[in-house]
Curated annotation (Swiss-Prot):
InterPro entries: dITP/XTP_pyrophosphatase, ITPase-like_fam, RdgB/HAM1. It comes from Shewanella oneidensis (strain ATCC 700550 / JCM 31522 / CIP 106686 / LMG 19005 / NCIMB 14063 / MR-1). Pyrophosphatase that catalyzes the hydrolysis of nucleoside triphosphates to their monophosphate derivatives, with a high preference for the non-canonical purine nucleotides XTP (xanthosine triphosphate), dITP (deoxyinosine triphosphate) and ITP. Seems to function as a house-cleaning enzyme that removes non-canonical purine nucleotides from the nucleotide pool, thus preventing their incorporation into DNA/RNA and avoiding chromosomal lesions. Keywords: Hydrolase, Magnesium, Metal-binding, Nucleotide metabolism, Nucleotide-binding. The active site is at residue 69. Binds 1 Mg(2+) ion per subunit. Its EC number is 3.6.1.66. The lineage of its organism: Bacteria, Pseudomonadati, Pseudomonadota, Gammaproteobacteria, Alteromonadales. Belongs to the HAM1 NTPase family. This is dITP/XTP pyrophosphatase.
């Protein structure tokens, strides 16, 4: 089975990637399995940070790597928290800390509080890959006033997807994989990886 390292320690992301790539005979391994430390995200865009993370993981593990850089953009806040979504409430903030800070920041704003999740995925064959595969997708919606659901991570409990009445954390994993920014970007990435021959015939199901 082909192995690709995910340049993240986020268990929620690992589950999403592993579930969607399993059909292609690919096992997604967390970088923690190789004792890869988190790298400083010094970029000013999602693309830059994803490349930094993928290169770091590939260099240390010797495996091909996928990195995800994603975040939530709130229109009322001019795109904040953006690339700082994971550390919106501080460098060591947990998901709940970030959610509570955003709810507090928006408490005086009425609906609709439009927002979107952005996701950039980068696949690097090796650390010096000069032509990494880069895919981007978004998921439109708005920020709710309360948290709902527990089938998700990050800001999922307060994100109401466009044309839906439930939060992202109230959706089934299959539904979320179809609609979400990460799910859509991963479909793009899988297609691009197939076109470039990353998956061998015996991998594809």
């Amino acid at each position: 089975m082909q192995q690709i390292v995910l340049a993240s320690g986020n268990k929620g992301k690992l589950a999403e990637f592993d579930q969607m790539l399993a059909a292609y005979g690919v096992k997604v391994l967390p970088q923690s399995q190789f004792n890869v430390s988190e790298v400083a995200e010094t970029g000013t865009t999602f693309v830059e940070n994803a490349i930094i993370k993928a290169r770091h993981a590939a260099q240390i593990t010797g495996h091909a790597a996928i990195a995800d850089d994603s975040g939530l953009e709130v229109d009322l806040l001019q795109g904040v928290p953006g690339i700082y979504s994971a550390r919106y409430a501080g460098e060591n903030a947990k998901d709940q800390d970030n959610v509570l800070k955003l709810l507090d920041t928006l408490k005086d704003y009425p609906a609709p509080r439009t927002a979107r999740f952005q996701c950039v995925l980068v696949y690097m064959r090796h650390a010096k890959d000069p032509t990494p595969i880069i895919c981007q997708a978004s998921w439109e919606g708005q920020i709710d006033f309360v948290q709902r659901g527990d089938n998700g991570h990050g800001y999922d409990p307060i994100f109401i997807p466009e044309h839906h009445d439930c939060s992202a954390a109230q959706m089934s994993s299959d539904e979320k994989n179809t609609l979400s920014h990460r799910g859509k970007a991963l479909v793009q990435l899988i297609t691009a990886m197939q076109e470039k021959g990353v998956f061998t015939d015996r991998n594809a199901q």
